[in-house]
Amino acid sequence: MRVVLQRSKEASVTVDGEIVGQIPFGLTLLVGITHEDTEKDATYIAEKIANLRIFEDESGKMNHSVLDVEGQVLSISQFTLYGDCRKGRRPNFMDAAKPDYAEHLYDFFNEEVRKQGLHVETGEFGAMMDVSLINDGPVTLIVESK
């Protein structure tokens, strides 16, 4: 499992002109799932993200988690994170999980994040989405389970 995490001042996701998910501040996640991922991977990533200390304390050091600052999470499914661009000029997505399996694991992942005590908004799995955010910092990390 691969997640691109962005600390966000605000974020939203729109499908067909309608906002389907929106957070005031917290973390925006682009979530990629490969066919080798399991529920164990999803749980690991959910716990890691909830507890990563990437928000500043009073002295400006990254000492607080999204839980500590009472932030929220906007989670977007993103199969293109497993695009392989090493050959040719068109990405190969063979490493991305098949849609049925990916949707199950994506839903499971979001529930695991909620179990950590976070409010989670989502996009619409498999839809063409417009994602808007104000990246705070910017702080952008890639979190992987393997």
Swiss-Prot record:
A molecular-function term among this protein's GO annotations = Ser(Gly)-tRNA(Ala) hydrolase activity
Domain of life, per UniProt, equals Bacteria
Motif Gly-cisPro motif, important for rejection of L-amino acids mapped to chain: 137-138
Keywords assigned: Cytoplasm, Hydrolase, RNA-binding, tRNA-binding
| Chemical reaction(s) catalysed | glycyl-tRNA(Ala) + H2O = tRNA(Ala) + glycine + H(+); a D-aminoacyl-tRNA + H2O = a tRNA + a D-alpha-amino acid + H(+)
The record's note on its domains: A Gly-cisPro motif from one monomer fits into the active site of the other monomer to allow specific chiral rejection of L-amino acids.
Name the family the entry cites: Belongs to the DTD family.
Function comment: An aminoacyl-tRNA editing enzyme that deacylates mischarged D-aminoacyl-tRNAs. Also deacylates mischarged glycyl-tRNA(Ala), protecting cells against glycine mischarging by AlaRS. Acts via tRNA-based rather than protein-based catalysis; rejects L-amino acids rather than detecting D-amino acids in the active site. By recycling D-aminoacyl-tRNA to D-amino acids and free tRNA molecules, this enzyme counteracts the toxicity associated with the formation of D-aminoacyl-tRNA entities in vivo and helps enforce protein L-homochirality.
Q: What is this protein called?
A: D-aminoacyl-tRNA deacylase
The gene name reads: dtd
